[in-house]
Amino acid sequence: MQTVVGGAITAAAAAGAGAGLWWYAAMWPQSQIFGPQLIAGRDPMEAALTFDDGPNGDTTLRLLDILAEHDAQATFFLIGDCVRQQPQIARRVAEAGHLIGNHSMTHPVLAWQSAARIREELSGCNAIFEDVIGAKARYFRPPHGARRPAVLRTARELGMTPVLWNVTAFDWNPISAEEIAGNIDRGIATNRRKGRGSNILLHDGGHMGLGQPRMPSLSATAQVLAKARAGGMRFVTVDAWG
């Protein structure tokens, strides 16, 4: 009986460890277990502001104004369905010289989807981009950061580099601009100590639909740009890193 019980416990422990490893590989933004993904460059004085889930109406337009005021370029990972609904704003983002990346067509958790659905989401988004802004994306960020080998493989087959991040603003939570800016400042400081650049995850939209309020994110962006620039930080788009 002890042997049977012991074997069951060992099997359960192994299953738990395997599940934990899979979760880490699929969900931790800096994990490379499922294959190489672009995180950041090696210069600790470089940072990339990246904005997910747009375009989002006046919020995105105001963000473009803030970036222009600070002479900064950013990377926008846009949802295809939002681009379809607001093509004029997506064109404004591109015309302002910002880098546009693919964030899927409808923002599902791709790690749980079939291979056919993954390809449909990525290729559909790029088809919208080609129609609206005249070019497919060269970079892809998985919604929620959730990926598995098939997600990364499909992105590469479609000519895109998978991109994750190493600074999380946590701006999807109902927190203040000061809290968001503090999260970013701490992330940048950690990366500088480790001798690497900072890839900052922010949001100008929301995958639940258009009109998501993001004013704290915009205010935090202005704060971070002013403070980091004063400290000698340079802001780049993710294509500077690969």
Describe each model-derived feature in a short phrase.
Residues V132-A146, V151, A155:
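Basic- and aromatic-lined ligand-binding clefts that recognize polyanionic substrates
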Residues A146, L152-R193, M233-G242:
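His/Asp/Glu-enriched short active-site or ligand-binding loop at hydrolase and phosphoryl-transfer sites
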Residues F51, L78-G80, N102-S104, P142-H144, ...:
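A cross-domain feature marking catalytic cores of carbohydrate-active enzymes
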Residues M1-T50, L61, D65-T75, R186, ...:
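Terminal accessory/targeting
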Residues A26-A111, R117, E121, I128, ...:
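Active-site beta->alpha N-cap acidic-glycine motif
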Residues R91, I118-L122, A177-I184, R214-A220:
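Charged helix-capping and loop-helix junction motifs
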Residues P108-Q113, H207-G211:
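A short acidic, helix-capping loop that chelates divalent metal ions and anchors anionic groups
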